[in-house]
């Protein structure tokens, strides 16, 4: 799950709080099964559901499938709350925002529950991205900003403690997959990073 740390960091950023507990189910189903290194098959997880609990009661979930790339949007982020839903879709660069204002207004059985009123759809992109490369340009931007911080002797955009917490979420997910039980972040981090 360490390969998903950037998603765990994004969850912290969006929620404005630190993960408390992780429950995960996953495994290796397709990728690298035919490879051998020193006589062993690599143990790279290629699919998982990871639920992350936060102190406020908020939850975030990662749905990882590294062998289902052939879809219109193989990366989707959804944020759902009592006011509505925000969806970011890649590589179509689509952002959708909808409100719950008209949900559940059925006049007759069989009619859709929503009318679509309040749904905004737009395409978004950063014109500074010269080469999309990995992660649809995000890696390019990360490298640019990191290089600038090094040149200016400035702070990294993501501080070390945030990075450590997100790696710990990945480790907790691995443990949860191995044991079938929730894992507490307190078992992976010192108290000052919780």
List where the protein language model places each region.
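Short, conserved clusters of charged catalytic residues that mark active-site
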Residues: 6, 155-158, 168
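Residues at helix-coil transition
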Residues: 16, 148-152, 178
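Rossmann-like dinucleotide-binding domain that binds NAD(P)(H)
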Residues: 1-74, 161
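C-terminal glycine/acidic-rich active-site capping loop/insertion
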Residues: 21, 31-41, 45, 49-54, ...
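Short arginine-rich
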Residues: 169-179
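A general structural signal for well-ordered alpha-helical segments in protein cores
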Residues: 7-8, 143-144, 170
